[in-house]
């Protein structure tokens, strides 16, 4: 969920935006803005050469019975984000105990490394296959690897958001992947004229894959963004997958 939901469920949310040489400040207390605007703009509280946004918030104990964060979920999300953005470094610090826990997440292999991590306890059949392309203003990248397992594990992301129920980008990937494999199988003579095509389940048996797209105007089903709904995402993913495979 986005900042509007976090704001509504927090005792306070404090924001500092570093942009165009200045630090701008905003603050909300139980969803109500407490910073006065200056000529319709957030006030400047300092100068800086940096860019970025710093957000501090405190979950509201009047809404939540428990306000302690689950560190494993926070770490997992940070690590996932590092895989999806190979040039990004994320620093995790937990200062709640007597000693600060400090972890640096940086994954220069990107989603190739993500697939390797997903398969680290499984027997793999080949090196990770990776490709990336752009069409219709949509960037598509995917990585996959087959294992000796009998199920598929395909994860879909749009703009770094995990789509637990998949969506159009996953549909495009699956459809074209099956089409290309069938065409290749017939070209090699593995499938004869009298043979039926492999099904999608046949082709993806044992596959681990990560499909990540960057979309300028994504549409999701539901507030939690579990499923991508853009038809152009299906076309873009299908075209890039078909061209690269």
What is the predicted role of each segment?
Residues 42, 72, 79-81, 87-223:
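GHKL/Histidine-kinase-like ATPase module
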Residues 64, 162-165, 233:
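Flexible beta-alpha connector loops of hexameric P-loop NTPases
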């Amino acid at each position: 969920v986005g900042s509007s939901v976090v704001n509504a469920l927090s005792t306070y949310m404090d924001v500092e935006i570093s942009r165009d040489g200045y630090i701008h400040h905003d603050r909300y207390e139980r969803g109500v803005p407490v910073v006065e605007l200056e000529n319709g703009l957030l006030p400047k509280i300092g100068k800086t050469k940096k860019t970025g946004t710093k957000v501090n918030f405190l979950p509201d104990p009047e809404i939540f019975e428990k306000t302690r964060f689950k560190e494993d979920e926070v770490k997992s999300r940070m690590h996932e984000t590092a895989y999806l953005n190979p040039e990004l470094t994320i620093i995790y610090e937990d200062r709640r105990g007597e000693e600060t826990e400090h972890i640096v997440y940086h994954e220069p292999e990107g989603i190739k490394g993500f697939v390797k991590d997903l398969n680290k306890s499984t027997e793999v059949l080949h090196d990770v296959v990776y490709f990336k392309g752009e069409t219709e203003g949509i960037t598509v990248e995917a990585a996959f690897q087959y294992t000796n397992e009998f199920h598929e594990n395909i994860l879909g992301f749009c703009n770094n958001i995990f789509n637990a129920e998949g969506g159009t980008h996953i549909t495009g990937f699956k459809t074209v992947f099956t089409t290309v494999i069938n065409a290749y199988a017939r070209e090699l003579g593995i499938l004869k004229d009298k043979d039926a095509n492999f099904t999608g389940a046949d082709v993806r048996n044992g596959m681990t894959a990560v499909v990540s797209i960057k979309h300028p105007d994504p549409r999701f089903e539901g507030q939690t963004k579990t499923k991508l709904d853009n038809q152009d995402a299906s076309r873009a993913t299908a075209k890039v997958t078909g061209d690269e495979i």
